[in-house]
Amino acid sequence: MTYTLLNKIDDPADLRKLDRRQLDTLAEELRAYVLESVSQTGGHLSSNLGTVELTIALHYVFDTPNDRVVWDVGHQSYPHKILTGRRDRMSTLRQYGGISGFPRRAESEYDTFGTAHSSTSISAALGMALGARTRGEKRVGIAVIGDGAMTAGMAFEAMNNAGVYKDLPMLVVLNDNDMSISPPVGMLNKHLARLMSGQFYAATKKGIEKVLSVAPPVLEFAKRLEEHAKGMVVPATLFEEFGFDYVGPIDGHDLESLVPTLQNIRQRALEGHGPQFLHVVTKKGQGYKLAEADPILYHGPGKFNPAEGIRPSAKPSRKTYTQVFGEWLCDMAAADKRLIGVTPAMREGSGMVEFEKRFPDRYYDVGIAEQHAVTFAGGLACEGLKPVVAIYSTFLQRGYDQLIHDVALQNLPVVFALDRAGLVGADGATHAGVYDIPFLRCIPNMMVMVPADENECRQLLTTAFQQDCPTAVRYPRGAGVGVATQPELTALPVGKGEIRREGHARAGQRVAIMAFGSMVHPALTAAEQLDATVANMRFVKPLDVELVKQLAANHDFLVTVEEGATMGGAGSAVLEALAEAGIELPTLVLGLPDKFIDHGDPAHLLSLCGLDAAGIERSVRERFSLTAQPVKVASVA
């Protein structure tokens, strides 16, 4: 496809030079460009195809970047990036040194607020609007948020706050596409997906009349309903009660409707009519039939041929850790009826699809509500059940107070299965699970386990399930190391590691590497060159202190290695144990540096951080001034 109009647009100022009648053609070109780009790089597709017209309309009507647009979650911001001067860099999307898959302030002045976790946009836009007013500047703060993100309490906390400011130039755009990553849940989403029909309107009005005698304030709602015939009965009332002027729902793919509606809203906002709320209905995957038919499959695809669509790949030779968890969950549920599965809107990503099919009465998707998920699981545990919360490591951060106050303080037996621990690659710093070890191991009653391979992951999940205290099992994204999983539900001894390799270096060069989780196998490879001992520690908490002492007694140097933050991490736990035992021995702590790691290929990122086998070997030699071992070359007859 030729991009006649799109090639003329280097920023929104160029966009605003177009005649309104040209916008539909631009939308066709922009949608085609998004599809072409993502098919070549991989990335988020369905959500971006669904926001093309909305993105065009926002930049056409509002004075960006003076008016601040905040994209909630941000994975739907590719059209925005293309229209704001980054069209020619889309080929670098989510690659090391390339542009991010999410809005990023350091990347463009049009990325007014960095996002990636959900439900933050309204708070940020409110802060921007009030900040501008404090500085005597006139601009509109705009939050674009999906219906899935509206299930999080933070969004409503922000709206409750925003409604207080009756003259604040602020706009919330609800992008109602009836789908977060997994189909959204909860009563709010049921209402958002239910466009008013004549029968629904009549039934609602009749119901209101019945309660007028006990709820006089509802009379005003009935009048508004009849006068304006609003398309969304419950949301209109709900959002207006928060202090917003509600408009909608309107077709989010109809520029003839979007542009004038937004123009009117902008004028009202700048004239001091207070916070505005626009409800648009869009379709994920819009314009690409394969994505329309299966938006979940096309949510975040790798490279593919748009003409053919995503083809089933050959069955991988190695299971992913997510698959290992999903299989274990079903097996344990079959063995123990107390098991309950809980996820905050990550059914597919966390490997719970089969569990939901087999055990629908024991599966709870609580929506994008991590705080609620943690406390909800605590409530289940109070009733003698054994909840397993499947959650990405990075998202557990959002429920930290609940983890401490509602679960650990009461010593409730909740299992936290932490997927995506460590670096995650293309999604970058916002999704990296690198802080879980420090923030978990400092909590009393909490156990923290770190499997080295697929079968050990299954065993440690079983170990966690058998405990009468809160537990966490962290495992990385992607395929394992190729170890077959055994069908038995076998637990491992609590707080005990193992020696995976005995070193035989000469005195003065004896190195012991204590490896945690995903770092065991790189450590084993490095140890071959160092002739070092390698311990698979398995537990961060309780730490195998006896093993630490044993290694210290028989070696000249100690090394810890983990795929996580070193400040307060597993290495810190080892140093604390050594100090408490009064042991002084040169110790090298390896892990991720004290900075945010950008997006890129995971193997490349680990190499840059010195956490591949070569990096581990190099760091050990440099720190302890070890000489290279002579390489034995087999004679050739």
Curated annotation (Swiss-Prot):
Q: Which cofactor does it need?
A: Mg(2+); thiamine diphosphate
Does the UniProt entry include the keyword Glycoprotein? no
Report whether Magnesium shows up as a keyword of the record: yes
The UniProt note on the cofactor reads as follows:
Binds 1 Mg(2+) ion per subunit.
Q: Which PANTHER family match?
A: 1-D-DEOXYXYLULOSE 5-PHOSPHATE SYNTHASE-RELATED, 1-DEOXY-D-XYLULOSE-5-PHOSPHATE SYNTHASE, CHLOROPLASTIC
Under the GO molecular function aspect, what terms does this record hold? 1-deoxy-D-xylulose-5-phosphate synthase activity; magnesium ion binding; thiamine pyrophosphate binding
Disulphide-bridged cysteine pairs:
none
Stated EC number for the protein is 2.2.1.7
What this chain does, per the entry, is described as:
Catalyzes the acyloin condensation reaction between C atoms 2 and 3 of pyruvate and glyceraldehyde 3-phosphate to yield 1-deoxy-D-xylulose-5-phosphate (DXP).
The UniProt family comment states: Belongs to the transketolase family. DXPS subfamily.
Q: Which CDD domains match?
A: TPP_DXS, TPP_PYR_DXS_TK_like
* Pfam families the record matches: DXP_synthase_N (PF13292), Transket_pyr (PF02779), Transketolase_C (PF02780)
Can you name this protein?
1-deoxy-D-xylulose-5-phosphate synthase
User: Gene Ontology cellular component?
Assistant: cytosol
Which UniProt keywords are given for this protein, alphabetically ordered? Isoprene biosynthesis, Magnesium, Metal-binding, Thiamine biosynthesis, Thiamine pyrophosphate, Transferase
